[in-house]
């Protein structure tokens, strides 16, 4: 089983294109939904999400285990624990958290064979073979990480993070809409849907801002859910819909201001470099002999990367920040939030994959220290551990 354990959603080879929300969700009627059980919800108003991770670290094991239990023991997606597990973890996960993950996998779920790795390592395999060097730009939920991967292994000194992700954009949109239109502060799930449907990355922010002031060419209307004809709402087409009885949000510069904070965090008074400056810093922090290769293999992944205009804006702003003699090339898959999972599928089919894994028998004998050694390359002395 392959598990891309994202901070917003879990992707697995057992669930196809479906995503499992990595959260406990409480409805307005106090019903609690665990992970994929959210599909049973009939009223998406005022949903409250409790997530196991914050700022790129797993902080709540009770929630994470509840979501995993629901996934592993579900009759439709459940797994045979005699099988193997490939699991992703967040960049720069604390060693004790990694050790706890290993313990849960073997002692709680009893998997026979297991490999844990950072998601960026799997992205390096997503093209069908392992790239010698690539730079993974993961625009995720809690934050955006830039990670150099050299010969299939993360180069930790080059990892950089921008503390802006899908969550930040949704919260800003929620506050803006509540100030300008209706009070939507309790409607995180619906506003997140609005963001996904109408927002885009501007290629020239100042120009679009001026255009939005002078004309309505960028304005769209979003019909809010009435829970009779729609549970999540939709973008209004005036030619097809009679809006006289609809409660709608008119969105103009909000459409591109929310994504702009990733490229210019100072908009929300966040004292950090923007995404493209952060990418340039990551490349500069990598070994000199690999910098050109990293520039030519930039892989963009994560849910925020689905926003229209993301790739072209990144290329436009990044080009002046890297040496002119470097060839720059970016890749964005049709489903960038599933690129990591695709890389995992390629890796598990490699003849040497089992050599990367720790078996339950080995874990029972040597414990979590063997996992740390095999997954992260730290020194391990079998004689010392078995003594």
Curated annotation (Swiss-Prot):
One of the GO BP terms on file: chromatin remodeling
One cellular component (GO) term of this entry: cytoplasm
Cited InterPro entries: Actin, ATPase_NBD
Compartment(s) of residence: Cytoplasm; Cytoplasm, Cytoskeleton; Nucleus
Top-level taxon in the UniProt lineage: Eukaryota
Keyword tags: Activator, Chromatin regulator, Cytoplasm, Cytoskeleton, Nucleus, Transcription, Transcription regulation
Matches recorded under CDD domains: ASKHA_NBD_Arp6
SMART domains in the record: ACTIN (SM00268)
GO molecular function: nucleosome binding
Subunit structure: Component of the SWR1 chromatin remodeling complex.
UniProt record similarity statement: Belongs to the actin family. ARP6 subfamily.
Annotated function: Component of the SWR1 complex which mediates the ATP-dependent exchange of histone H2A for the H2A variant HZT1 leading to transcriptional regulation of selected genes by chromatin remodeling. Involved in chromosome stability.
Protein name: Actin-like protein ARP6
Species this protein is from: Yarrowia lipolytica (strain CLIB 122 / E 150)
């Amino acid at each position: 089983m392959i598990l891309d354990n994202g901070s917003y959603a879990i992707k697995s080879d057992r669930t196809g294109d479906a995503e499992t929300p990595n959260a406990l969700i409480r409805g307005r009627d106090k019903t609690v939904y665990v992970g994929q059980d959210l599909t049973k919800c009939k009223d998406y108003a005022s949903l409250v999400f409790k997530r196991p991770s914050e700022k790129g670290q797993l902080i709540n094991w009770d929630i994470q285990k509840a979501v995993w239990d629901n996934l592993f023991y579900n009759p439709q997606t459940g797994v045979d624990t005699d099988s193997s597990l490939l699991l992703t973890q967040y960049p720069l996960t604390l060693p004790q958290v990694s050790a706890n993950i290993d313990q849960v996998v073997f002692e709680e779920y009893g998997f026979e064979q297991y490999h844990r790795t950072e998601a960026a390592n799997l992205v390096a395999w997503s093209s069908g073979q392992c790239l010698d060097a690539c730079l993974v730009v993961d625009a995720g939920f809690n934050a955006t990480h830039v990670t150099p991967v050299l010969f299939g292994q993360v180069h930790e000194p080059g990892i950089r993070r921008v503390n802006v992700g899908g969550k930040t954009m949704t919260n800003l949109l929620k506050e803006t809409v509540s100030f300008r239109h209706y009070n939507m502060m309790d409607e995180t799930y619906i506003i997140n849907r609005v963001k996904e449907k109408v927002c885009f990355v501007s290629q020239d922010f100042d120009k679009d801002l001026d255009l939005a002031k002078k004309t309505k060419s960028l304005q769209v209307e979003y019909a809010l859910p009435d829970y009779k004809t729609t549970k999540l709402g939709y973008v209004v087409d005036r030619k097809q819909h009679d809006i006289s009885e609809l409660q709608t949000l008119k969105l103009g510069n909000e459409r591109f201001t929310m994504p702009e904070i990733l490229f210019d965090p100072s908009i929300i008074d966040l004292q950090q470099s923007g995404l493209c400056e952060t990418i340039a810093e990551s490349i500069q922090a990598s070994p000199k002999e690999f910098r050109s290769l990293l520039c030519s293999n930039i892989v963009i992944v994560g849910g925020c990367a689905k926003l229209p205009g993301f790739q072209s804006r990144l290329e436009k702003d990044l080009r002046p920040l890297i040496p002119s003699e470097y060839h720059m090339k970016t890749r964005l898959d049709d489903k960038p939030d599933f690129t990591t999972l695709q890389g995992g599928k390629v890796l598990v089919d490699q003849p040497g994959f089992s050599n990367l894994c720790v078996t339950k028998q080995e874990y029972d004998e040597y414990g979590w220290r063997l996992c740390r050694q095999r997954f992260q390359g730290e020194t391990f002395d079998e004689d010392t551990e078995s003594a």
